[in-house]
Curated annotation (Swiss-Prot):
It comes from Edwardsiella ictaluri (strain 93-146). May bind 1 zinc ion per subunit. It catalyses: ATP + H2O + cellular proteinSide 1 = ADP + phosphate + cellular proteinSide 2. GO terms for biological process: intracellular protein transmembrane transport; protein import; protein targeting; protein transport by the Sec complex. The gene is secA. SUPFAM superfamilies: Helical scaffold and wing domains of SecA (SSF81886), P-loop containing nucleoside triphosphate hydrolases (SSF52540), Pre-protein crosslinking domain of SecA (SSF81767). GO terms for molecular function: ATP binding; metal ion binding; protein-exporting ATPase activity. Its EC number is 7.4.2.8. The keyword rRNA processing does not apply. It is an enzyme of class 7 (translocase). This is Protein translocase subunit SecA. Monomer and homodimer. Part of the essential Sec protein translocation apparatus which comprises SecA, SecYEG and auxiliary proteins SecDF-YajC and YidC. ATP binds at Q87, G105, E106, G107, K108, T109, D512. GO terms for cellular component: cell envelope Sec protein transport complex; cytosol; plasma membrane. The lineage of its organism: Bacteria, Pseudomonadati, Pseudomonadota, Gammaproteobacteria, Enterobacterales. Induction: Repressed under conditions of excess protein secretion capacity and derepressed when protein secretion becomes limiting. This is regulated by SecM.
């Protein structure tokens, strides 16, 4: 109550921020007449002037009013578009390390040009981040004329580009690209073997479009660069064939997992667990097909990988549905993004899940991968000196932006008042009733010329609605992951009178739905349109536009509520842009995923009490409140998952930063001879200490063990026993010094052969390779530790603290292993003179030829009988001299059994 009263008197923090910024907007507006008087050359010269002032020590923010006024004037001359005052406000919010919430259709792309220009003046680079390649390319090409007019360069960073092209894109003042590509480039740069291979500059300013999608929806998915691991595709196929024998348990006792079924499914956490009966059955089935010995337990250490395969196969069958979670296209399983409905080409599920789904669908199974490098978006974007973002729906996630990214959310007012009508939800008992009501609503609205956009949560649902519309004889377009290429065209024309468009989730974000259709798209279809043709198209569009407004504007139909209120708001936000008329309504049923998992019992009881009949809908504030509570529950759980992921990844992040810093110092620095000498001392001290403990009696020394260790691991043949026999005065300290001196001399003798320059290059290469190899193994070990760490909770220990403690112990051990491996490899390397190499190569060739002749003669002797038998088998069939020999040796017939028959 008190907070509400104080807000009423002093205004909210949002209001106070906007009040302060409006004063700067007035200042920019006062500069407009002066800017209009400038010639193009003088306006372009402003960029050089601003950079000069920055070089003399001026603060970047002191240039803001003049820089924004310059961009606004340049936009008027290049595009014929003037930034609204609210867009200037949005630009200021983005410059202040904040999230700007700007409604759909308010011109976020044009707003972004203001802070992008201002921050590009520093010369450190600006990264504009979009959700897909199409938007990155579109926005870069659309804004390029404006930035180039002002003397700034623009780059586009797309997947599959060659390193020189990427380097040029990053060297530009402003770079457009996708979040995935920026993240992967960062990881690839930290796997480079020379400074020239790296493409990114220091991360300065990131301007994230659709910031909620990138920093929240995708935050649970880490970016992983992986390499091939061992092949186990056969095992996936064998295990997959056993899963249909298992029966799902409808209700289970969560404590004992007793019941009729063989496995239970928890849809909330997306986990599958075997029951006691299921475990017994799967062990019997595995024994029957010979994968496991009879009487053996699936939980025994030897079968731990088999358990992993069974769990992956169960999850693939019970939790992952075709055309909802993935599609199968040209023999490949492609993941569908649950938030956008787009396919994610090249992305694969980890932990063997993708291979299990491939086995289930009967397509070719790709090898499992091993993690080489990984980072979450949360940690990648926090590497930027300055981060800002914009979206149409951020306010519901303001707390998360603030607590994780330290970004405040500012709601920017609309240019014109919003007049869209958001109608209350209608809830039906069954999905069939709901679909019938949706079809009827579409029929009524299209009859009066109102365009309708139907939002679905999956490809499967979009195709179901499409099928019903086809049956009802209603023409429509479908926009889902299967028709990704036509996305922009379908969305652009979704506002035509009476048009019906079905879209999965937020497919088509970034393209505005113009009421009356897009006249620009129609003009683009003509090769060289005349002025008269353009005017005729515009006049026709104006007629359609007015007709759609008269019919009530664009109507949005949501076929079910999403887990997040924000994504529902994004769907609604497609209507009512720039003060246009519009309406929206959600149709729900008790069979919807969200309702079934989180709210069905409460709402079903409510509907029964109200005496609901099949086909009837309930429309009540209580129901809407129950659904909102269910969504809040899911949002809260997802936030906890993301926060927990971040807390665990922060541990890995500190280690990643240490490794990458060390790696970059290696790449950028000179030789590493001092480092090698230093770690050689450390390594030999540890080795000698383990056989000759400090300040110990000679009787306690294991001299034979030390000699063997030095011989095996460091290629050092040292007669330590002989030294001790011949030199009684040799004590522990002098012995240590002598061993180290001999090791250094042994190494220097190699250096004298190849030369210092080559040895320095070799040292650096070995250090990088060893570091990468051990880091890869460390990441795998961290993954395993992470998977089982929650079990420490049963021992009354905090899993997070245990994870931190153990992971840092593992990290320290890895650094010690790095020192040991590097010195061991460098000590054992065989160095030869060029003439020695040539002589050895000649000897190797002669040995190989002699061995081949012996094998051939042996092969001919052993198989002469087989040749006679084969001749009788082939009968009259003539074998060509150059045909492959029927014995299966792989040689030509004339060089194998043909000789015996000759």
């Amino acid at each position: 109550m008190l907070i509400k009263l104080l807000t009423k008197v002093f205004g909210s923090r949002n209001d106070r921020t906007l009040r302060r910024m409006r004063k700067v907007v007035e200042q920019i507006n006062r500069m407009e007449p002066e800017m209009e008087q400038l010639s193009d050359e003088l306006l372009k010269a402003k960029t050089v002037e601003f950079r000069g002032r920055l070089a003399q020590g001026a603060a970047l923010d002191s240039l803001l009013p003049e820089a924004f006024a310059t961009v606004r004037e340049a936009s008027k001359r290049v595009f014929g578009m003037r930034h609204f005052d609210v867009q200037l406000l949005g630009g200021m919010v983005l410059n202040e390390r904040c999230i700007a919430e700007m409604r759909t259709g308010e011109g976020k792309t044009l707003t972004a040009t203001l802070p992008a220009y201002l921050n590009a003046l520093t010369g450190k680079g600006v990264h504009v981040v979009t959700v897909n390649d199409y938007l990155a390319q579109r926005d870069a090409e659309n804004n390029r004329p404006l930035f180039e007019f002002l003397g700034l360069s623009v780059g586009i960073n797309l997947p599959g580009m060659a390193a020189p092209a990427k380097r040029a894109a990053y060297a530009a003042d402003i770079t457009y690209g996708t979040n995935n590509e920026y993240g992967f480039d960062y990881l690839r740069d930290n796997m480079a073997f020379s400074p020239e291979e790296r493409v990114q500059r220091k991360l300065h300013y990131a301007l994230v479009d659709e910031v909620d999608s990138i920093l929240i929806d995708e935050a649970r998915t880490p970016l992983i660069i992986s390499g091939p691991a061992e092949d186990s595709s056969e095992l996936y196929i064998k295990v997959d064939k056993l899963i249909p024998h298992l029966k799902r348990q409808e209700k289970e006792d969560s404590d004992t997992f007793q019941g009729d079924g063989h496995y239970s499914v928890d849809e909330k956490t997306r986990q599958v667990n075997l029951t006691e009966r299921g475990l017994v059955l799967i062990e019997e089935l595995l024994a029957d097909v010979g994968i496991m010995d009879e009487g053996e337990s699936l939980y025994s250490p030897a079968n731990i990988m088999l358990m992993h395969h069974v769990t992956a196969a169960l999850r693939a069958h019970a939790l992952f549905t075709r055309d909802v979670d993935y599609i199968v296209k040209e023999g490949e399983v492609i993941i569908v993004d649950e938030h956008t409905g787009r396919t994610m080409q090249g992305r694969r599920w980890s932990d063997g899940l993708h291979q299990a789904v491939e086995a289930k669908e009967g397509v070719q199974i790709q090898n499992e991968n091993q993690t080489l490098a990984s980072i979450t978006f949360q940690n990648y974007f926090r590497l930027y000196e300055k981060l800002a973002g914009m979206t149409g729906t951020a306010d519901t996630e303001a707390f998360e932006f603030s607590s994780i990214y330290k970004l405040d959310t500012i709601v920017v007012p609309t240019n014109r008042p919003m007049i869209r009508k958001d109608l209350p939800d209608l809830v039906y008992m069954t999905e069939q009733d709901k679909i019938a009501a949706i079809i009827e609503d579409i029929r009524e609205r299209t009859a009066k010329g109102q365009p309708v956009l139907v939002g679905t949560v999956s490809i499967e649902k979009s195709e179901m609605v499409s099928h019903e519309l086809t049956k009802a004889g209603i023409a429509h377009s479908v926009l889902n992951a299967k028709f990704h290429a036509k996305e922009a065209d379908i969305v652009a024309q979704a506002g035509q009178p009476g048009a019906v468009t079905i879209a999965t989730n937020m497919a088509g974000r970034g393209t505005d739905i113009m009421l009356g259709g897009s006249w620009q798209a129609e003009i683009a279809l003509l090769e060289s349109p005349t002025e008269a043709q353009i005017e005729a198209i515009k006049a026709e569009w104006q007629t359609c536009h007015d007709a759609v407004l008269a019919a009530g504007g664009l109507h949005i139909i949501g076929t079910e509520r999403h887990e997040s209120r924000r994504i529902d708001n994004q769907l609604r936000g497609r209507s009512g842009r720039q003060g246009d008329a519009g309406s929206s309504r959600f149709y729900l049923s008790l069979e919807d995923s969200l309702m079934r998992i989180f709210a069905s019992d409460r709402v079903a009881n409510m509907m029964r009490k109200l005496g609901m009949k099949p086909g009837e809908a309930i429309e009540h504030p209580w129901v809407t409140k129950a659904i909102a509570n269910a969504q809040r529950k899911v949002e809260s759980r997802n936030f906890d998952i993301r926060k927990q992921l971040l807390e665990y990844d922060d541990v890995a992040s500190d280690q990643r930063r240490a490794i990458y810093t060390q790696r970059n110092e290696l790449l950028d620095g000179g030789d590493v001879v001092d480092t090698i000498n230093s770690i050689r001392e450390d390594v030999f001290k540890v080795v000698i200490d383990s056989y000759i403990p400090p300040q110990s009696l000679e009787e306690m020394w294991d001299v034979a063990g030390l000699e063997e260790r030095l011989r095996n691991d460091f290629d050092l043949e040292l007669p330590i026993t002989e030294w001790l026999d011949k030199e009684p005065e040799l004590h522990e300290e002098t012995l240590r010094e002598r061993i180290l001196t001999m090791a250094v001399e042994h190494y220097q003798s190699k250096e004298e052969v190849v030369g210092g320059e080559m040895m320095r290059s070799f040292e650096k290469g070995i250090m990088l390779q060893t570091l990468d190899s051990l880091w890869k193994e460390h990441l795998a070990a961290m993954d395993y530790l992470r998977q089982g760490i929650h079990l420490r909770g049963y021992a009354q220990k905090d899993p997070k603290q245990e994870y931190k403690r153990e992971s840092f112990a593992m990290f320290a051990a890895m650094l010690e292993s790095l020192k040991y491996e590097v010195i061991s490899v460098l000590s054992k390397v065989q160095v030869r003179m060029p003439e020695e190499v040539e002589a050895l190569e000649r000897q190797r060739r002669e040995d190989a030829e002699r061995l081949a002749r012996q094998q051939q003669l042996s092969h001919l002797d052993d198989q002469s009988a087989a040749a006679q038998e084969m001749a009788s088998q082939t009968g009259d069939r003539k074998i060509g001299r150059n045909d492959p020999c029927p014995c299966g040796s792989g040689k030509k017939y004339k060089q194998c059994h043909g000789r015996l028959n000759a």
